[in-house]
């Protein structure tokens, strides 16, 4: 099976909607019966183990870890769908070839460096937003709903699923573009590593931030 056009461009490819119908069986190589079963179990609140991790000075971080089969399916979606989609260059977290070090390198020798942490980052990304992201990327509505359903838990993006970091990068693409463009106008730089946003540049950038 040949690699289809980049998923982000499927909307401009003739017959893209027909390709969606065979996505699970031919491209992801997942049995539709298995997909239906997993979606049913997720809707019933199954297939995830939820626990909390204590953080000094912060609220505990809630982790929802998928079971072995669901995690396998999510990794397949990550590799064959999500990683074929384009994210913004300002995103450095969970991206091949980028790291916390490449993120920090963008802010060396700057007069002002400010780091902000987005509160409850993953839980604020809802099923509706994930579903919308897949639809805007060219998937038919029913396929987008199934993909979003396999990647969400209790209506939100779970921290602990292998698909969540890349989905968050794709969801934040517009935000990353707007903040990057704004900082550039003032001679500054913006990057994001997961839920950590960093702004740097001359003192003028202080007027842009709600500090």
What are the residue ranges of the model-derived segments?
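Short, conserved non-catalytic motifs in the polymerase core
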Residues: 49-74, 93-95, 115, 149-168
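N-terminal low-complexity, intrinsically disordered segments
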Residues: 18-35, 79-81, 85, 125, ...
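Non-catalytic, polymerase-adjacent accessory regions of viral genome-replication enzymes
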Residues: 1-51
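Conserved polymerase palm-domain catalytic core
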Residues: 106-194, 198-211
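Active-site-proximal segment of RNA-dependent polymerases
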Residues: 70-115, 120-121
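Short linear loop/turn motifs
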Residues: 38-44, 93-96, 145-152
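Nucleotide/phosphate-binding site architecture used for ATP/NTP-dependent chemistry
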Residues: 17-22, 30, 61, 68-70, ...
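Short amphipathic beta-strand starts and helix->beta connectors
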Residues: 46-48, 98-100, 182-186
């Amino acid at each position: 099976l040949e690699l289809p056009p980049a998923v982000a461009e499927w909307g401009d490819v003739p017959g893209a909607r027909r390709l969606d119908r065979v996505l699970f069986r031919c491209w992801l190589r997942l049995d539709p019966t298995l997909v239906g079963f997993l979606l049913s179990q997720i809707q019933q609140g199954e297939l995830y183990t939820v626990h909390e991790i204590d953080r000094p000075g912060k609220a505990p971080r809630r982790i929802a870890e998928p079971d072995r089969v669901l995690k396998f399916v999510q990794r397949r979606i990550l590799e064959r769908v999500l990683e074929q989609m384009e994210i913004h260059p300002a995103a450095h977290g969970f991206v091949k070839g980028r790291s916390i070090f490449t993120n920090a390198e963008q802010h060396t020798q700057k007069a002002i460096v400010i780091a902000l942490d987005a509160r409850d980052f993953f839980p604020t990304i809802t099923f509706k937003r994930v579903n919308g992201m897949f639809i805007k990327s060219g998937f038919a509505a029913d396929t987008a709903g199934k993909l979003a359903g396999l990647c969400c838990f209790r209506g939100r993006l779970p921290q602990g699923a292998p698909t969540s970091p890349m989905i968050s990068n794709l969801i934040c693409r517009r935000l990353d573009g707007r903040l990057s463009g704004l900082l550039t106008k003032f001679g500054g730089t913006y990057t994001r590593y997961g839920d950590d946003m960093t702004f740097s540049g001359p003192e003028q950038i202080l007027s842009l931030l709600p500090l």
